[in-house]
Structures are given as structure tokens and as C-alpha cells.
């Protein structure tokens, strides 16, 4: 029997890359590859890359420098190691990667992962293989499906890609160039994936896409289904207790999505809705095609539909031309909305984007100062949101043993980690927990009732409407 070959994948960036990494593992399993935690011991190392920020892509080249040493060590020991660069850096830079890092054997863009087996063979025969085209075929129809044991090993939460690409062309963003135009998967294929996951123990699904609420997939009735209708359908699949989605664009929030948050108890009341800036002038320069007040109105619609809903967001400071007044408008928006969590970044010019050619730049020192001020406000809001839960009882979906002996960790509806002393038998169950204290970002608490599974109702949530 041929011994299995070892595969190590390191993913950078977004949730889509986590999903893509799992699908690459599934695609390579029939070729005899099994995952290993060590890059040094691997026969194949894949760097699944992100191109959103300059530091992310530079990390890849730093990692390739370390892998060159590991590859040389393997060769001295008589073992061949292949190195592949996948993801958005691969798509954006293509042949430049092998010129800059000759240690790389394969460069493969996000739309071509189903070609990995043949690309590895080609690299073995020809020395290099680069594929970064946008093929017309839907890659999702060709990627291997995970086996039941692989699904169970990955735990009770899973990502499912329903949409890929973006048509918005924000001036700072490379996604339309690296992931292509918006494409939605057919409803039937998504349902098949979800049923397979549910049959093998998955309780929580996060539907993902670069612009997930732009989803309009072909439904079984011959009509185009929006995200809200898809969520409603998936909520009825036995075994699925929680639904989430990410990442959203304010312009694509429609009535069906608002209704889903009003009506579906399985749909968690936590929405990641990036806005990037609170200044209309900067939003226009970013080509966001909405104003700060447009964003506020979207938030109001969600809150009218479900009172306990909470939000996270993304913000960029130091976008070209951002004045102190523009930045103060961002602080005002954050103060007014009140976030459970948010992510702030200094502007990073990406080659090939319109913003990279904008001349009126903000100094690094000013960016640092604004980032610190914004993050201080965000941190204070997150701390207040978390502390408000102390003393209350919340439902927690338990996921795995914690690092501390005897503890099991799960997550609340708002993705806050919660630790309790309990047996592993509660993993996969949703149970009420009294929150006793907060340590940094994690709760400590106690189970309130006997350890019996509680399923969230799929009936409409009572509202004042």
C-alpha cells in the first residue's frame, strides 16, 4: 500500500479562505493526501492567501522564505516537497510569484482549485504550473465533497459558500479583480451541501460570500431566490439549529432579509455590516454608493424587525483625502450606532485599484493616531456590550472541550465564547447558561438546567408588528 502523502494548508484572511482550504483538502484526499499540522513534515504545502492589505501579501513572501529552507531540508533527506500559492495573491500576481519566489511549484487562483491534482502533476513534470484564469465553469460543481468522517472531524459549525465575487468596485478593494464578478450558487446545490453537513452533526451554518446578501441563486421553482428566502428554506432542514451569514453590503439589504431576521429564530441576531467610513465625502471617494444616513436607515430597519439584534462592522482610517472632519464623522457614526464588535484598519493602497492613484494621502503618523482613537471607542463599546450580559441567562451552542480541564466552550448568539464546567456530552447542544463573569472577551458561567438538548423553534419570533 502506498503511504499517504502529507498536506499542510495555511490560510490567511477571510472566512471564504477557510472554506476554500477545506474544499482543497477534500479535492486532494482522493490523491492520497492527509492533513498534517507541520509544514516541515509535509509533502505539499499550500499557502491560501489574502490580498486585501499589503501586510497580508508580504506575510506570504516571508513564509515562502521559511518554506525554502524546509524544502531544501526535505531534499537533503531524499523527500520531495511541493509548494503551492493559492488564493487572491495568486490571482493578482500570478507569474510574478514564481519570479520573486522560485521555490514555488504551483500558483492557482480561487476559481481553479478543482484543477489542483492536475496542476501538481504538471508541476512535477514541467517544474512549474500557473493557473489564474477565470474559467466559465462553476468551480463548485467540480470540487470534491467532504466525506462524512471529515465533516465530523471539523466540528459542529461549518461554512457554506453561497456566493462569490463582487460587482461593487469600491475604489480601495481588489476583490472584483481577484474573485471576479458576483456569482450565486443554485439553491439545490446549497441544500445538498447543507443536508450532508446536518446529517453528519453540523448544527450551525454560516453562509459566506464576498457580498453574500447579493445572493440571487436559481431556485427549484425556476425563480431567482434572494438570501432571505434561502435562509428561510435552510432553517427548515432538520439538525440545523443556527444560521448566520457574512459579509454583507448595505446596498443589498432587501425586504426578504429583514423579514428573515423578524421571522426565523434559527437566524442569529448578529450582523456584520461594513460601512468603512462615516463621512459622505469619503464614502463617495470609496465608490460605496451609499451615504452615512443610508447606512443608518438600514440599521434602523434591522432593529425594527428584531429588537435584540447587534452589529459588527469594518472601518478604514486614513483613506486618501480623509480630513479630521471626515474622521470625526466616522467617530460620530460609531457612537450613534453602538457596535458589539468592529474591525478597524489603516488604509493600505492595493496596486491596480483606483484609490492607489489618489494623490492626497494621509501621513502614517496621522493614520496611527486615528486608528488608536477609533479602536479605543470600538473597544469601549464591545466591553460594554459584553459586560451587559453578566448576570443574565443566554443560550449557548457548545462546540468543543476548552483548554482548561473539565471546561466545555461554546458560543452565544453574538459569537461570544462561553465556558462552563461540564462533560463533553453537551457538545452540539444548545443550553441556557447563567453568565457569571467576563475574562477579556470570554464568559464564564454555569448551566442552568439539566443537560438536555434544546432546539430553537423555527416558528416566527413574536414581534410588536
Curated annotation (Swiss-Prot):
Subunit structure: Monomer.
Catalytic reaction(s) noted: N(6)-dimethylallyladenosine(37) in tRNA + (sulfur carrier)-SH + AH2 + 2 S-adenosyl-L-methionine = 2-methylsulfanyl-N(6)-dimethylallyladenosine(37) in tRNA + (sulfur carrier)-H + 5'-deoxyadenosine + L-methionine + A + S-adenosyl-L-homocysteine + 2 H(+)
Ranges for domain MTTase N-terminal: 5-125
Domain Radical SAM core stretches: 152-384
GO biological process: tRNA methylthiolation
Protein family: Belongs to the methylthiotransferase family. MiaB subfamily.
Localization, UniProt: Cytoplasm
Protein name per UniProt: tRNA-2-methylthio-N(6)-dimethylallyladenosine synthase
Cofactor section: [4Fe-4S] cluster
Cofactor note: Binds 2 [4Fe-4S] clusters. One cluster is coordinated with 3 cysteines and an exchangeable S-adenosyl-L-methionine.
Binding-site residues for [4Fe-4S] cluster 2, renumbered to this chain: 166, 170, 173
Keywords in alphabetical order: 4Fe-4S, Cytoplasm, Iron, Iron-sulfur, Metal-binding, S-adenosyl-L-methionine, Transferase, tRNA processing
A molecular function (GO) term: metal ion binding
Main location: cytoplasm
CDD domains (alphabetical): Radical_SAM
Originating species: Bradyrhizobium diazoefficiens (strain JCM 10833 / BCRC 13528 / IAM 13628 / NBRC 14792 / USDA 110)
SS bond partners: none
UniProt GO cellular component terms: cytosol
Cited InterPro entries: Elp3/MiaA/NifB-like_rSAM (IPR006638), Methylthiotransferase (IPR005839), Methylthiotransferase_CS (IPR020612), Methylthiotransferase_N (IPR013848), Methylthiotransferase_N_sf (IPR038135), MiaB_methiolase (IPR006463), rSAM (IPR007197), rSAM_horseshoe (IPR023404)
EC nos: 2.8.4.3
Keyword Iron belongs to the record: yes
Entries under Pfam families matching the protein: Radical_SAM, TRAM, UPF0004
Span of domain TRAM: 387-449
